[in-house]
């Protein structure tokens, strides 16, 4: 099972960015990339990288349905909106490879 990282606040809120009218959760390949992106975006100041795996994805599916949207971040030094846009169903296969 593949593990990624996302940014979460101590109260449990997930970090998301507005992208063309949708809120999308940035997903990172490692915690270092998440911290690099955090250092470049003051909106992430109160968020910390946490593991984002199939269990977390399933938790989101139960609470949000299949409406959750994501940005797979390949270069954390660029603006987050340059990530790969993925729907819930497009991200799910990445979690099991």
Task: Name the predicted role of every residue range.
Residues 1-97:
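Conserved NAD+-utilizing ADP-ribose enzyme module
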């Amino acid at each position: 099972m593949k593990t990624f990282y996302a940014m979460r606040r101590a109260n449990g809120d997930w970090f998301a960015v507005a992208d063309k009218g949708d809120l999308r959760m940035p997903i990172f390949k490692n915690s270092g990339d998440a911290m690099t992106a955090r250092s470049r975006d003051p909106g992430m100041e109160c968020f910390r990288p946490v593991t984002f795996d199939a269990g977390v994805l399933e938790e989101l599916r139960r609470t949000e349905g299949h409406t959750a949207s994501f940005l797979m971040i390949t270069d954390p030094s660029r603006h987050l909106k340059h990530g790969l846009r993925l729907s819930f169903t497009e991200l799910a296969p990445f979690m099991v490879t």
